[in-house]
From Swiss-Prot:
Localization per record: Nucleus, Nucleolus
Source organism phylogeny: Eukaryota, Metazoa, Chordata, Craniata, Vertebrata
Name assigned to this protein: TATA box-binding protein-associated factor RNA polymerase I subunit B
Predominant place of localization: nucleus
Region annotation (B-linker) ranges: 70-74
Species annotation: Xenopus laevis (African clawed frog)
InterPro entries: Rrn7_cyclin_C, Rrn7_cyclin_N, TAF1B/Rrn7, TF_Rrn7_Zf
Record: residues binding Zn(2+): 13, 16, 31, 34
Zinc finger boundaries on the chain: RRN7-type: 4-39
Region (N-terminal cyclin fold): 75-256
Cellular component, GO annotation: RNA polymerase I core factor complex; RNA polymerase transcription factor SL1 complex
Chain spans, region B-reader: 40-69
Domain notes: Although it shares weak sequence similarity with GTF2B/TFIIB, displays a similar subdomain organization as GTF2B/TFIIB, with a N-terminal zinc finger, a connecting region (composed of B-reader and B-linker regions), followed by 2 cyclin folds. The RRN7-type zinc finger plays an essential postrecruitment role in Pol I transcription at a step preceding synthesis of the first 40 nucleotides.
Amino acid sequence: MEAEDGRGYNVPCPQCSEINWAISDEGRYYCMSCHTIIEKTREVEDSEVFVNLGKIQYISRGLRKKRKQEKGWEWYVCEGFQFILIKQAESLQALGVAPQIKDEIICTFWRRYLQKTNQAYVKRPVYRNTLNLRESDSSATELDSETDEFSDGITTDASDRLSVATEDIASGSESAVSIQSGSVDGVSHTKMSKNWKPWNYVKMSMPMTLAFCYLALLWLRASITLSDLLRFVFEKRIPYFNAHQYLPEEIKLYGQDVRIFRMQSFPVYNDILNKAYELGHYLDLPRFPEIIKNCYLHPNVLCMKYLMEANLPDELHHWTCQVAEKTGTDDLHLLTFDPACKKARHIRYDVQAVALIIVVLKLLFALDDNTEWQLSTFAERMNQRDKEKPIFEFQSWYQTVRSCYEKAQQALEEEYGRFTWKSDCLLYYSHTSKAVLQKRKQMSENLHRQFSKLAGAAPDTGKQGPSSFLFKWDEQNTDRICFHGHSLEAILQQGDKPATAINTHYWLNSLKKCKSRICQHSELYEQSNFPRSYHFIVSLFAFLLRVEHCVVHHEVCLIEETFFQEFQGKKNKQKQKPRKQN
């Protein structure tokens, strides 16, 4: 229908400051430039009202149906998270994880979470109470108190789409969706505090979806560590950023839903790990399957993996196994996650493995900016005398790995700079800002298109397949030296059957354990306080795991404390004076 002319109204538009008015079929003024609707209505005569009464009623009924279609489904926040969890599980299946991770593991954890939070599978769902807390529109009406239970209305079709039974909701009612949120409980979910039961422990969020995935991987003992999981998230192989794009078109996001499902920061290693342990305790899960010796998460297996990743000799694996045995880090009771034991230390399997490697390197090379270079000079002389069997040289390894590490670090920083946070679909917090955001998005796309033409098309290298290794040292037709098969004869005592190191010096990162209740030593790491060789190795492994330096350094301190505890105990006993006998 054509809009009537509104040139008789000469007040500028409050949005675009232009005078270009028209009158809609409902009799309201709107700006033809920016489509802003104002409260002013057309003044009509009584006779005209009676003549067009039937026409107005017909038009209003049609507009009401159109609004309901634009609004989409009446959905809950937990439904949105369930769609995202399904897509994340399917992505993990595509990466090679066992098929039961979706239907048996994550689905079971999710049902238990819904039951523990009284959202489903209970007699009285929590939504009957949260609906009363929702801020509704002035034209909205309350839902019927006798609505069917949420758990009874959950159905999953062939495409794993969850739907909620809403037969008892009136077709013309607009009360289920607040003007501040596209979902039914978006406002109440955002305002809900941790002290309010049953949300006192775990509140669902996007980082919590990764906690679900990590618990499922840990239950299956899959060949994906937490650092690998976060790296796949950054590479967008697992839905996390702009995950709302995977939701059905009938689920509309705006208002508080944008704050719930839109992520503007990268997930942090320790944060996801703490959430996973917190979730396991909250769900009262049973003891997880044991981490046995041939399991991927066992320190002996992970140490071999990261020795290959760092281009270190294979003979170091024998030393890492000995240190793991002496420190007890290979104990299956300590490695296995038991949610019932709430005081157990959080096991960082990948960080613990690289910390074992660093401790072994300190035992053999000292890493004090002096001993390792002297041993490297001695190894170079041995290689000059006998060129058949290569002997490991620390200096040659340092130069080879450093050049590759710096290139990879620069490439990663460029990827961080090119990372796109904006989604293809438009997200808005209110209907009044929708037109403004649409204009901004259109201008941004036009500018991006123009700059792309000026800069020229970038060469498309293609997206590489997923891999657990960042560096491939054994590739042919490269100038890189592979040190995997090199010998450690230059740093070991000749003739000793139990191999002993030539180096007899070792410096400790920390001599005393901090007993303060609020300890921040694990979050502090000053580069100037440590030798450059040690800092380079910590930086290398921190880059491989995509964690901060303090995380790796703190794990090294914990292993050193356990490793030298027996030695320090014997030394203290020798210093004690014998008691005098009467």
